[in-house]
Amino acid sequence: MVAIFEFTCSCCGKLHEGSPSFGYKAPMHYEVLSEQDKQSLATLTDDLCEIDSPEGTDYFARVVLELPIHGVEEPFLWGVWVSLSEESFARYTSTWGEHDESDSYFGWFSNRLPYYPDTINLKTNVRPRNGGLRPYLELEPSAHPLATHYFEGLSIQEAQRIAEEVMHGGS
């Protein structure tokens, strides 16, 4: 197994070392709000988000999705957000730092990832972790390419293509 993932970027010519890791500061549902609505309807921290609306409150948690890279020890990491039910959000936040790591919360994927067809509302399970670690995200099986990469892994070439698209846009 290769110790570290590295590639020479076809866009900028730089050598990038270490498995790719990209993250989102907020769920897509927060990002589309006006600045006024962000101030009046939403609460956002590094790990949690709540958005009020006439229909009720939406709850989100920041999680980590790991995609294995064939022949590489460290996975491709996405820091993304998932929506949780009010009950799951309350249970998750009430056990902060003392989670039952065998617990699982159903959630909906809440960011659009580049390279992939629309990832909003992919079915997920959130697995809490202790020790200050963000929860681990499990995707439910589906025909979506992100789910395929989650279960079957990425080739080194695919990981490079995705990283280049995130860093430089377009493919």
Regions found by a protein language model. Give the residues of each.
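A general marker of short, structured functional hotspots
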Residues: 9-12, 20, 26, 88, ...
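Basic, glycine-/proline-tolerant helical and adjacent loop/strand elements
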Residues: 1-70
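Short, surface-exposed linear patches
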Residues: 30-33, 87, 160-161
